[in-house]
């Protein structure tokens, strides 16, 4: 009995290999699901997010004044990034709202990338895009998409 080797049952080895592979597969699926969750939370506003009109100094929508376009809704203020196309003939103004959805403050007209700070207590935002070289100074419905595409607004949805 002194020189005998112990042999491991092939079924046992096969079971161990299968268990390890299943654990690796489950871990991979969890990692993908976690990363996908983050990607789904990052949103980009498209043309359909905007309407013709302005946001007045009180943070209210004015659809009678057609010199700009604005986001239709308030969006959660977690992380916001605003980028403009090079040579864009627009500016944008960012409006900050509190939990009561009342205007807290706004930025000056911006013409470059925004990754700024937010007022303390601000929970929501809206964007107004104002053309700087519109022929007649009035934004028409067919121009909305053109102006909206010049400014890319991305935000993280909780």
Question: What role is predicted for each listed range?
Answer:
Residues 70-92, 114-118:
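Extra-cytoplasmic beta-strand recognition segments
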Residues 86-114:
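Extracellular ligand-binding interfaces
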Residues 55-56, 94-99, 130-132:
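Core beta-strand residues in small-molecule sensory/regulatory alpha/beta domains
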Residues 24-74, 133, 138-158:
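Glycan-recognition and processing domains
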Residues 7-22:
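N-terminal Sec-pathway targeting helices
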Residues 78-83, 118-137:
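Noncatalytic modules at the cell exterior or secretory-pathway interfaces
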Residues 64, 89-96, 126, 145-147:
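Extracellular or exported targeting regions of proteins
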């Amino acid at each position: 009995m002194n020189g005998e080797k112990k042999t491991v049952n092939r079924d046992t080895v096969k079971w161990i290999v299968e268990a390890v592979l299943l654990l690796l597969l489950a871990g991979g699926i969890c990692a993908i699901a976690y990363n996908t969750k983050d990607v789904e939370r990052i949103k980009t506003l498209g043309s359909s997010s905007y309407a013709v009109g302005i946001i007045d100094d009180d943070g209210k929508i004015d659809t009678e004044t057609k010199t700009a376009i604005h986001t239709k809704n308030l969006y959660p203020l977690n992380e916001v990034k605003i980028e403009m196309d090079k040579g864009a003939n627009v500016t944008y103004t960012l409006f900050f709202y509190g939990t009561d959805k009342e205007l807290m403050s706004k930025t000056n007209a911006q013409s470059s990338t925004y990754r700024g700070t937010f007022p303390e207590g601000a929970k929501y935002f809206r964007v107004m895009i104002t053309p700087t070289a519109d022929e007649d100074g009035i934004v028409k419905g067919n121009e909305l998409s053109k102006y909206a595409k010049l400014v890319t607004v991305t935000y993280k949805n909780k």
